[in-house]
From Swiss-Prot:
Gene Ontology MF, one: protein serine/threonine phosphatase inhibitor activity
Protein name: Protein SDS23
Localization: Cytoplasm; Nucleus
Domain CBS: 140-198, 225-283, 310-369, 454-533
Segments of this protein annotated with the region Disordered: 31-109, 426-471, 529-548
Any one annotated GO CC term: cytoplasm
Record's keyword terms, sorted: CBS domain, Cytoplasm, Nucleus, Repeat
Intrachain S-S bonds: none
Compositionally biased residues, Low complexity: 63-89, 430-467
Polar residues composition bias: residue spans: 90-100
Biased composition (Basic residues): 34-44
Record lineage: Eukaryota, Fungi, Dikarya, Ascomycota, Saccharomycotina
Alphabetical list of SMART domains matching this protein: CBS
Length: 548
């Protein structure tokens, strides 16, 4: 998100962290709008609801995007079908069926021309105005972050590389210049940890013994433990329409190559695509009807716990707050998910545990955390985040059925998560109360009083004494540069959130659904491109079952 302090008036000094409400109030401004931002906001009066985000520019600007009105409702989409040279695009259910008569996309005639400016970002904005779905993939990749590791590298060294370059995944080459890489991510790190703890079994006895005896294990062996999709590749000359058909099927990332498809130029992930769309939302006028629609109107996410999800919907997977953390990690591995909701006995959402949080238990000194409750682990994560960044606000991982798609996108970008939990507030919300409730939760801060931790560690289910006592190279030598969480010293050094404060600020309602990056990209692909039949569960079915 760019310049969050400029989004809402009276946001305070530039040194203060912007609240999430400020970040969610509207998409980021375009570069050439900054100079006229104050005038635009004075003219609009900022009276609109947070849940309804107008994307049209002020008439006083140097250029304008016409608001989607009745004149555009009858327009037919003339999306081009996917390029036949798109490589693996057809492997994941991308359809070439023409998309017409949706009423959600307008022709290019309603968009005024933007003069070409000198800076690269402003030149890119001009391309957005013409048509967003035909933007070439070369505009989206970060070539400076293209990093590979050899399959012979140890897991701990690969993990250190992830931390060093702030990556969530990294391609693993079997041989130099390998164009069919597997990727190492935090799901693989979780599998490695579970193997060390003897919570899962694999057919390779040598790898199992090395893991449990603390010997280095090649990352090339570990990446094979977690079922993965094929390494999809697209040339950088392809466009957004094509890649949406792939990422909208549940594939998490796509390699972007040179036009000849002989060299990988970068990696485009679901999360980066969503951030790109949100950062440039003001340029994508045809998306306005979708962005201002609610999740329940768009029919994405599971919104009724009394009926089973359809074949195109994600299941709501949760764990009780009093269950041990090790069970949450095992459940994420078994279900092949990257985060899990933590609920109380009544089904109310009390928190979120992500597979990236496994980095907090990669040291042998942190083993006791594995046997403490999920509720306790959430408080430890929040405390650690406060020590590292100075932030005292709760991250918000939930939305409501009435939340707009724009608000959902903004929260996904702000939290850098792959999914948000849909909750039903304790009282049936109206259009006004829902926005008010969400605002009060989003701006909530914590000022916890020190509370000693007295929970004792107990062996994880299925973990042998040998597994608990060995010193894995990863668990003993990895230094991620962050605050080290040591349960042995928590009783005197750690500030833990009091239960009553924790529940007041973070418990927001009954868990009734989940909306993921795949759901949203799939929606955009079906409504705005030629990929009208793309199935969001295709990639999950391809991956098959995980290691038991």
């Amino acid at each position: 998100m760019t310049n969050p302090k400029n989004v809402v008036p009276n946001s305070g000094t530039s040194s203060r962290h912007a609240s999430i409400v400020e970040m969610l109030s509207s998409p980021p401004l375009l570069p050439h709008q900054h100079a006229q931002h104050a005038h635009v906001h004075r003219s609009q009066g900022r009276s609109e609801s947070i849940e309804s985000i107008p994307l049209q520019r002020s008439a006083s600007g140097t250029s304008s995007i016409t608001s989607m009105g009745s004149n555009n409702d009858s327009s037919s989409a003339n999306a081009q079908s996917a390029n036949p040279s798109a490589g693996s695009a057809t492997n994941v259910g991308a359809s070439g069926t023409p998309h017409s008569g949706s009423g959600l996309e307008a022709g290019n005639t309603d968009l005024s021309a933007v003069p070409m400016l000198q800076t690269p970002s402003q030149c890119l904005n001009s391309a957005h105005i013409h048509t967003w779905k035909h933007i070439q993939l070369s505009q989206l990749i970060e070539q400076n972050k293209l990093i590979f590791v050899p399959g012979s590298l140890s897991v701990e060294e690969t993990f250190n590389t992830l931390i060093k370059y702030h990556l969530t995944s990294i391609p693993v080459e079997a041989v130099p210049g390998d164009m069919n890489c597997l990727t190492f991510d935090y799901n693989d790190l979780n599998s490695y940890l579970l193997l060390v703890l003897n919570k899962i079994t694999i057919n390779n006895k040598q790898v199992t013994q090395d893991c449990q005896n603390g010997k280095p294990v090649a990352v090339g062996d570990i990446v094979k433990l977690t079922p993965k999709n094929p390494f999809y590749k697209l040339p950088e000359t392809e466009n957004l329409s094509t890649v949406m058909g792939i990422l909208g099927s549940g594939v998490h990332r796509v390699a972007i190559t040179n036009p000849e498809m002989t060299q990988i130029r970068g990696i485009l992930s679901q999360r980066r695509l969503i951030k790109y769309i949100w950062d440039n939302a003001r340029s994508f006028g045809t998306l306005e009807p979708l962005l201002n629609s609610s999740l329940q109107d768009l029919k994405i996410g599971v919104l009724n716990t009394n009926s089973k999800p359809t074949s195109r919907q994600s299941r709501v997977i949760s764990i009780q707050g009093e269950e041990p953390l090790i069970m949450a990690l095992y459940k994420m591995h078994k279900e092949r998910i990257s985060s899990i909701a933590v609920i109380d006995p009544q089904g109310n959402l009390i928190g979120n545990i992500s597979v990236t949080d496994v980095k907090h238990v990669t040291r042998t000194s942190q083993y006791p955390l594995l046997h403490k409750t999920c509720r306790h682990f959430i408080s430890v994560i929040l405390n650690s985040r406060g020590l590292e960044t100075g932030k005292d606000s709760f991250p918000i991982f939930h939305v409501y059925p009435t939340s707009s798609l724009a608000r959902t996108l903004a929260k996904l970008v702000a939290t850098k998560s792959h999914r948000l939990w849909i909750v039903q507030p304790q009282e049936a919300p109206t259009a006004t109360s829902s926005s008010s409730t969400s605002s009060s939760v989003n701006t909530g801060t914590i000022s916890p009083n020190p509370t000693p931790t007295t929970t004792s560690a107990s062996p994880a289910p299925g973990a042998t004494p040998n597994a608990l006592n060995n010193h894995s190279p990863l668990l003993s030598t990895v230094d991620d540069g962050h605050t080290v969480i040591n349960p042995a010293t928590q009783a005197t050094n750690t500030t833990v959130i009091q239960p009553n404060l924790f529940e007041k600020e973070y418990r927001t309602g009954k868990l009734i659904g989940v909306v993921s990056l795949t759901d949203i990209i799939n929606l955009l692909a079906r409504k705005q491109t030629a990929n009208t039949e793309v199935d969001p569960q295709t990639a999950r079915r391809q991956r098959g079952p995980a290691t038991q």
